[in-house]
């Protein structure tokens, strides 16, 4: 654990329970199914062989599982656990029903709780601020526009018929009038706002710029405002040019 960093507030004991070993924490996490085959791992490498990230990086689900079984806590500070993008191919291919992707999720949260690699959360600050202020996440405008290009009139037709489609599926009409207050109540009760303050403080300590609201206002970047879709989202906020971190 990094000594000068205060642990994240509202650490969920069910998410990362305090145990003697990494393996026990992974197995007892609320994220983990009872059928997890961690102790049955035979290090066959099927997980790494099927992993898309392993083809282009040094990421190895097999090595991560090995470190967890050996209780090697250096894995919490490893860049490797941030290369997974949760496709679950490793879980699908494992002959022992292990789930390296689930283990990685637990390891990431453990690292964050201890103030390790907090910069990986910087990119998500804007999304979190938007959710807290407006009760909704950001709209992936670029993705929608690309779908229009790929699918043409078919996609436009789907958009126009969205409400009839919802009706056919038995879904209620969209009503977001009270969403903001409800979302804020959930965020408040779960300690989200305290976590957000903690993350912002760590980001500022590390000198990471371009992700806090104060970084995006009152600067010369107004002349270079990014268009909708540069980061895959529509936004009316201003950026300093700092690109998103890959997590």
From Swiss-Prot:
Q: Where is this region: Disordered?
A: 216-247
Biological processes per GO annotation: methanogenesis
Q: Does the keyword Magnesium apply?
A: no
The catalytic activity, as recorded, is:
coenzyme B + coenzyme M + 2 oxidized [2Fe-2S]-[ferredoxin] = coenzyme M-coenzyme B heterodisulfide + 2 reduced [2Fe-2S]-[ferredoxin] + 2 H(+)
Q: Which residues form a coiled coil?
A: none
The 4Fe-4S ferredoxin-type domain is annotated at 32-62
Q: Where is the composition biased (Basic and acidic residues)?
A: 216-240
UniProt GO cellular component terms:
cytoplasm
Q: Which UniProt keywords apply?
A: 4Fe-4S, Cytoplasm, Iron, Iron-sulfur, Metal-binding, Methanogenesis, Oxidoreductase
Q: Which residues bind [4Fe-4S] cluster 2?
A: 51, 84, 87, 90
What does the cofactor section's free text say about binding? Binds 2 [4Fe-4S] cluster.
A GO term, aspect molecular function = oxidoreductase activity
Name which cysteines form disulfide bonds.
Answer: none
Outline the inducing conditions: Induced on trimethylamine or methanol, but not on acetate as the sole energy source.
Under InterPro entries, the record lists: 4Fe4S_Fe-S-bd, 4Fe4S_Fe_S_CS, HdrC_heterodisulfide_reductase, HdrC_iron-sulfur_subunit, Helical_ferredxn
Specify which residues bind [4Fe-4S] cluster 1 according to the UniProt entry for this protein.
41, 44, 47, 94
Q: Name the pathway it acts in.
A: Cofactor metabolism; coenzyme M-coenzyme B heterodisulfide reduction; coenzyme B and coenzyme M from coenzyme M-coenzyme B heterodisulfide: step 1/1
Superkingdom, taxonomy of origin = Archaea
Q: What happens when the gene is disrupted?
A: Triple hdrA1C1B1 deletion decreases methane production from methanol, but does not affect methanogenesis from acetate. Deletion results in up-regulation of CoB-SH and CoM-SH synthesis and transport, and methylsulfide methyltransferases.
Q: Where in the cell is the protein located?
A: Cytoplasm
Cofactors needed by this protein, per the record, are: [4Fe-4S] cluster
What is this protein's function? Part of a complex that catalyzes the reversible reduction of CoM-S-S-CoB to the thiol-coenzymes H-S-CoM (coenzyme M) and H-S-CoB (coenzyme B). Probably involved in methylotrophic methanogenesis but not in aceticlastic methanogenesis.
**Family from the record:** Belongs to the HdrC family.
**Subunit structure, briefly?**
The ferredoxin:CoB-CoM heterodisulfide reductase is composed of three subunits; HdrA1, HdrB1 and HdrC1.
Q: Which PANTHER family does the UniProt record give?
A: IRON-SULFUR-BINDING OXIDOREDUCTASE FADF-RELATED (PTHR43255:SF1), IRON-SULFUR-BINDING OXIDOREDUCTASE FADF-RELATED-RELATED (PTHR43255)
* Name the UniProt record assigns to this protein: Ferredoxin:CoB-CoM heterodisulfide reductase subunit C
- Which species is this UniProt entry from? Methanosarcina acetivorans (strain ATCC 35395 / DSM 2834 / JCM 12185 / C2A)
User: Gene encoding this polypeptide?
Assistant: hdrC1
């Amino acid at each position: 654990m990094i000594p000068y960093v205060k642990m994240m507030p509202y650490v969920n004991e069910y998410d990362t329970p305090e145990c003697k070993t990494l393996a026990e924490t992974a197995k007892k996490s609320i994220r983990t199914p009872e059928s997890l085959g961690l102790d049955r791992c035979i290090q066959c490498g099927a997980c790494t062989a099927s992993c898309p990230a392993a083809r282009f990086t040094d990421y190895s689900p097999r090595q991560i599982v090995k470190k967890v079984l050996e209780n090697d806590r250096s894995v919490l500070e490893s860049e490797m656990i941030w290369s997974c993008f949760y496709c679950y191919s490793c879980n699908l291919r494992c002959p022992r029903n292990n789930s390296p992707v689930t283990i990685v999720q637990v390891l990431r949260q453990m690292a964050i709780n201890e103030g390790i690699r907090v910069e990986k959360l910087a990119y998500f600050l804007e999304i979190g601020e938007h959710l807290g202020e407006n009760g909704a996440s950001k709209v992936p405008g670029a993705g929608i526009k690309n779908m229009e290009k790929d699918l043409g009139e078919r996609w436009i037709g789907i958009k126009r018929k969205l409400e009839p489609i919802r009706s056919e599926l038995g879904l209620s009409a969209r009503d977001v009038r009270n969403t903001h207050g409800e979302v804020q109540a959930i965020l408040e009760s779960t300690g989200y706002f305290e976590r957000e303050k903690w993350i912002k403080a760590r980001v500022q300590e590390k000198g990471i710029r371009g992700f806090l609201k104060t970084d995006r206002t009152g600067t010369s970047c107004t002349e270079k405002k990014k268009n909708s879709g540069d980061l895959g989202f529509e936004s009316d906020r201003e950026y300093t040019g700092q690109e998103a971190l890959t997590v």
